[in-house]
Curated annotation (Swiss-Prot):
Species of origin: Acinetobacter baumannii (strain ATCC 17978 / DSM 105126 / CIP 53.77 / LMG 1025 / NCDC KC755 / 5377)
Catalytic activity reported: putrescine + NADPH + O2 = N-hydroxyputrescine + NADP(+) + H2O
Function recorded in the entry: N-hydroxylating monooxygenase involved in the biosynthesis of fimsbactin A, the major siderophore produced by A.baumannii. Catalyzes the N-hydroxylation of the aliphatic diamine putrescine into N-hydroxyputrescine (NHP). Putrescine is the preferred substrate, but the enzyme can also catalyze the N-hydroxylation of cadaverine, with 4-fold lower catalytic efficiency. Cannot use lysine or ornithine as substrates. Uses both NADPH and NADH as the reducing cofactor with a preference for NADPH.
Entry binding sites for FAD: 17, 37-39, 44-45, 56, 121, 378, 389, 391
Family to which the UniProt record says this protein belongs: Belongs to the lysine N(6)-hydroxylase/L-ornithine N(5)-oxygenase family.
Name of the encoding gene: fbsI
GO-annotated molecular function: monooxygenase activity
Pathway entry: Siderophore biosynthesis
Subunit field text: Homotetramer.
Protein name, UniProt field: Putrescine N-hydroxylase
One GO biological process term: biosynthetic process
Keywords assigned: FAD, Flavoprotein, Monooxygenase, NADP, Oxidoreductase
Major enzyme class: oxidoreductase
Binding site residues for NADP(+): 54, 56, 98, 199, 223, 267, 301
Length: 446
């Protein structure tokens, strides 16, 4: 690393999205890039990988293929180099094991000389006269500074933990740390999981599998009206497309918030086949005796109170509008993830655009400032739709970021792939006509 060199891109955080950006910029000689992450090595959700768990999207949604299928860092090339391509073919599943996806990403990161771990970005300053950013990085060997024209934020998200759940590190943990604590969980008399998404489902299934050997009471609650599966119909999957992303971005802010609030089944549910596996396991376990387990929808965690050897958990059931208590020795939170603005951005906070609700405002090209020099990954469900955290759309976003920075289309970006249309054309829209006569609505409900 040359501290006097001016980079075109400094990436902050190395998750799948910024790692994909590093892979896609690697063949481009006109771009000088460097990426920093505070972790010791690439590690993507390894704390919640029960054996056999898979991604919920096909293998083609790897780091590079949707932008450049010929790229050396494709998953298929990884399999070929590791002599696993035929085995993957014979397995006959499009869905990658999560553990294998993690190994694939580690392999890609290790090939890239411009990706640096154990590198904590402390501060970012902007020199307006030079129109350059100075990034201060703390590494084991000391502090260094790098200068760049553009920043790409890829610091990722953190598990959601309600304030009233904080302060109980021995009894309340995030689903992200499940495997680290599993041995301890198996010694408890009662375990409660809160959260009805894929993570909560996988943990419930894993603990249910061993309930006979250990005899604990296993509770699984969600505030959702039911334990619902994701809608993965092919026409629904067209919503994970450039077409729908553009349409969603064109809506006004309040309408986008309203729409995203109605789309939980598109991205927050459980894979249908996994829902069925849970039911089949419950059926199998109940053959000879009742199972010490409870599953309850419509129940929002409201409060936590610590007793001598257990927690008193207060829930509110939305159907009957009443609160009730459960006792549990441990609580596993599977409530999803949220974005937190890195402290290193504080000196340049005034350069960032914000919407009317105090959220980072993204331009269509995923930049967050007027000069289109600060870009953000994995932010903006409220502006670009529910596909923002989707691994399958990472290449689309990275292609747009690269094309914007270079000012030309290096990676072609598809604009229309869906068979369906998400809005009428401008020419088809009827202009309202003022009239004093009575009008009769012909709006249909289907």
């Amino acid at each position: 690393m040359n501290s006097q060199h001016i980079y075109d891109i400094v990436g902050i955080g190395v998750g799948p999205f910024n790692l994909g950006l590093a892979c896609l910029t690697q063949p481009l000689n006109e771009l000088s890039t460097i990426f920093f992450d505070s972790k010791d090595e690439f590690d993507w959700h390894s704390g919640i990988m029960p054996e056999g768990s898979t991604l919920q999207i096909p293998f083609i949604a790897d780091l590079v293929s949707f932008a450049d299928p010929k790229n050396n860092y494709s998953f298929l090339n990884y399999l070929k180099l590791h002599n696993r391509l035929y085995q993957f073919f014979i397995r006959e599943s499009f869905f990658i094991l999560r553990a294998e996806y993690n190994l694939y990403c580690k392999w890609a990161a290790e090939q890239l000389e411009n990706v640096h771990f154990k590198s904590f970005v402390e501060r970012i300053d902007y020199d307006e006269s030079r129109q350059l950013y100075t990034v201060r990085v703390k590494q084991p060997q000391g502090e260094m500074k790098v200068v760049t024209k553009n920043l790409v934020l890829g610091t990722g998200t953190t598990p959601i933990t309600p304030k009233f759940c904080q302060g109980y590190p021995e009894q309340i943990q995030s689903s992200a740390d499940y495997l680290r604590h599993k041995k301890d969980y198996l010694t408890k008399k009662s375990i409660t999981i809160v959260g009805g998404g894929q993570s909560g489902a996988e943990i419930y299934y894993d603990l249910l599998s061993e309930i006979d050997q250990h005899g604990y009471q296993l509770n699984w609650l969600t505030k959702a009206p039911h334990f619902f599966s994701m809608d993965l119909g092919k026409l629904t999957l067209e919503y994970t497309s450039p077409d729908y992303t553009s349409h969603f971005y064109s809506l006004d802010e309040d309408k986008r918030d309203q729409v995203i609030g109605s789309q939980n089944a598109l991205y927050k549910g459980i894979e249908l086949s996994f829902v069925n596996r849970i039911y089949d396991l419950l059926y199998q376990k109940s053959l000879h005796q009742p199972i010490p387990t409870r599953m309850m929808p419509n129940c929002a965690l409201d409060a936590v109170e610590q007793q001598s050897n257990h927690l008193n958990l207060t829930f509110k059931n939305s159907d009957i509008n009443k609160r009730f208590k459960l006792e549990s020795e441990v609580l596993i939170l599977a409530l999803g993830y949220e974005y937190k603005i890195p402290e290193c951005l504080t000196p340049i906070r005034t350069l960032i655009n914000w919407d009317s609700k105090g959220r980072i405002a993204l331009n269509w090209n995923y930049s967050i400032n007027d000069d289109n020099t600060i870009f953000a990954q994995n932010i903006g469900i409220y502006s670009h739709g529910f596909t923002v955290p989707d691994l399958g759309m990472g290449c689309y976003r990275n292609a747009i970021i690269i094309n914007t920075i270079l000012g030309r289309e290096v990676y072609p970006v598809e604009k229309r792939i869906a068979y369906q249309e998400f809005a009428p054309t401008t020419e088809e829209i009827v202009t309202p006509v003022k009239t004093t006569a009575k009008s009769h609505s012909t709006e249909l409900s289907f």
